[in-house]
Regions:
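Extended, low-hydrophobicity, polar/charged segments
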Residues: 4-183
Length: 183
């Protein structure tokens, strides 16, 4: 079954981006650095926030390659960014240890936009308002590509980890768990 809805091609339930996706600041940053990536899009209504697993289904990818960007703060108010597979949970204990803090917790949702310049459900690790220490799940190391938010709901970036490394400074680390663990 082939259908075109909201300018997207739907083929047997898989959504494929049309040829032209509106550029985001994250995409422009990658273009400026001449880094290869693929822009993907999925249908998203207004303020609707979809989880990474749902997004993976909409773009026809495994949830293990669709990564979510999470922003945390430490006991001494340092901000730390974590990028993990959408089908996993952030281990606050592991992130605190690897980032050199005693304790880490998620920032309140209301602070995401003022801190990063991005909204919930559209937070990209690329081109945040400020540069924060960033840790990406070591599960990305051996993947040919990962998919991250492009900086707005409905837009994703498919990029090789080595190209992402050229765009932002990050460290691979064991920061996620398959099951939710109390921190």
């Amino acid at each position: 079954l082939l259908a075109i809805i909201n300018g997207l091609i739907h083929l047997n339930g898989i959504v494929m981006a049309k040829d032209k996706v509106d550029k985001t600041n994250a995409m422009r940053a990658l273009d400026q650095l001449k880094l290869e990536y693929e822009a993907l899009s999925y249908p998203c209504a207004g303020d609707e926030v979809l989880g990474g697993v749902e997004v993976a289904g909409l773009i026809g990818e495994s949830a293990s390659v669709v990564f979510k960007t999470l922003v945390t703060h430490s006991d001494n108010k340092d901000f730390v960014v974590a990028v993990i597979p959408s089908d996993e949970y952030l281990s606050l204990k592991k992130l605190a240890k690897i980032s050199g803090h005693k304790k880490i917790e998620m920032i309140p949702v209301a602070k995401i936009e003022s801190l990063t310049g991005y909204i919930r459900g559209g937070c990209s690790p690329i081109k945040m308002k400020k540069t924060f220490p960033t840790f990406i799940s070591d599960k990305a190391k051996d993947l040919p590509y990962i998919i991250i938010s492009a900086g707005k709901r409905g837009a994703q970036i498919k990029i090789a980890p080595e190209n992402l490394q050229k765009a932002i400074r990050y460290q691979f680390a064991d920061i996620s768990d398959v099951e939710e663990v109390e921190s």
